[in-house]
A protein has these predicted regions:
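Acidic, glycine-rich flexible loop/linker segments
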Residues: 2-150
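Conserved alpha/beta-domain cores
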Residues: 113-430
């Protein structure tokens, strides 16, 4: 990296990279730094050395796909992108958000995180145990998670397991797909989320349905009575029931809003699964997280979907670029909500895991640790970096940090407490 970067963006995935700026998502190579928008991500062909994402939607489904690649990434605004031109030699640092131009200097190697054994115990500097699980969508990603030292697979996005020919998946398909994933993850325990559809992750076999997958529309268990989803769910359960005899499996019911919903779908799943399979609820709305004590009375565990929860808290579609600045990962009110959830869970907080991008955002994980959370399901490439963060910080420091954040009034105050440069983070109310 040049000594004086011309731009400061928001760090998104760690690592340093250098290459020629390429402003199209196709024909990318390791000699390129790709300058693209979130809408371009689905059209990517080839893998660049690094990404610059313009007008990013950090919590969107498209950006989660990008994170799974494990490639250095920095987020910038449209005004910053005007200083960059196709073919320009660029270096980026995904840890600091620095972007610079220097044709003669290749990117330095970023410090490598410590390698850990699959399932190895992870503690803070003062001995508090933390579990870093992986959110995956394929057998390959499950294998990557095991190699990265994950404590387990905390979330299998089963909606991405779909026949390539566009036909409706059946029990045989899921039997093969789940077995491949479970074998790749071995010896780690695996939590499979039943089919969870969203507007931009609709399988080819599903006919058009109004409001399907929209933030305030039909998603998760709300679709489980619809054809052909009802049969697909049954086939997923059939496959999991057979595999549970030889693999450590948990089941997660998506987008549970009310206790009655949980009890209904939990009973349905329990009829199909052996008693060894624990069944959890995914809480992704204010109604769900504010009812955590009752959900924990019925569910074996609860996974809080932070991406959709933030969408609900800030009333902003996480996939919509024009609303991206409202989804503020440093807003003090967000952490006060997580403090309230933790307090209501009490000693049962150990049965809650946090899923999504939030814990991966720079500076946020120590705050969540300070609020009492110990289980996180994150994108597999992040695990070594987050593990190093955990090992290098004491719980007492995390608790002090969380207390300060929860008394802050503005995002700017949060950034100052976290000692983060506001230049490198979006102006959340621009």
């Amino acid at each position: 990296m040049p000594s004086e970067p011309i731009l400061h963006g928001m760090p998104y995935f760690p690592g340093r990279a250098a290459g020629r700026l390429h402003t199209r998502p196709d024909s990318l190579t390791g000699q390129h730094i790709a300058l693209i928008t979130p809408g371009d991500i689905r059209h990517i062909t080839g893998l660049p050395a690094g990404f610059l994402i313009v007008e990013p939607t950090p919590f969107s489904h498209a950006m989660i796909t990008l994170l799974g690649l494990g490639i250095p990434t920095v987020l910038i605004e449209a005004g910053q992108a005007q200083a960059l031109q196709t073919g320009m030699p660029v270096g980026i640092d995904g840890m600091t958000g620095e972007i610079g131009i220097n044709a003669g200097i290749p990117a330095r190697h970023a410090p490598s995180p410590q390698q850990r054994r699959p399932g190895a115990r992870l503690n803070t500097a003062d001995g508090t145990r933390v579990r870093l699980l992986a959110s995956v969508r394929s057998a390959a990603a499950a294998g990557q998670a095991a190699a990265a030292g994950a404590s387990g697979i905390g979330l299998v996005r089963s909606e991405f397991l779909s026949p390539q020919d566009g036909t409706i998946p059946d029990a045989d398909f899921y039997r093969r797909s789940f077995r491949d994933l479970l074998d790749a993850a071995a010896p780690l325990p695996v939590t499979v989320r039943l089919l969870d559809l969203a507007a931009d992750k609709l399988p080819a076999w599903l006919p058009p349905t109004p409001r399907l997958g929209e933030p305030l529309g039909l998603q998760g268990v709300r679709l489980y009575h619809a054809h052909p989803i009802q049969q697909v769910i049954q086939d997923q359960l059939t496959a999991l029931a057979e595999l549970a005899d030889t693999h450590a499996i948990r089941l997660l019911l998506p987008f549970i809003v009310r206790l009655e919903e949980l009890q209904c779908w939990q009973a349905m799943a329990r009829r199909r699964l052996p008693d060894s399979v624990r069944i959890g609820a995914m809480a992704e709305t204010l109604a769900a997280v504010l009812d955590i004590p009752h959900l924990l009375d019925s569910a074996d565990f609860v996974a809080i979907g932070c991406n959709d929860l933030m969408q609900a808290v800030f009333s902003a579609d996480r996939d919509e670029p024009v609303l991206r600045h409202y989804l503020d990962p440093y807003a003090p009110v967000l952490f006060r909500l997580f403090r309230q959830i933790a307090a209501s869970a009490g000693e049962r907080l150990e049965r809650i895991q946090l899923c999504g991008v939030l814990a991966q955002i720079q500076g946020v994980l120590p705050v969540l640790l300070g609020l009492g959370y110990r289980n996180f399901s994150v994108d597999a490439p992040f695990i070594p970096y987050l593990a190093d963060t955990i090992a290098g910080i004491s719980l007492s420091d995390c608790e002090a940090l969380a207390a300060d954040i929860c008394t802050a009034r503005t995002t700017q105050q949060s950034l100052e407490i976290l000692q983060l440069d506001s230049q490198r983070h979006p102006p959340y109310l621009a």
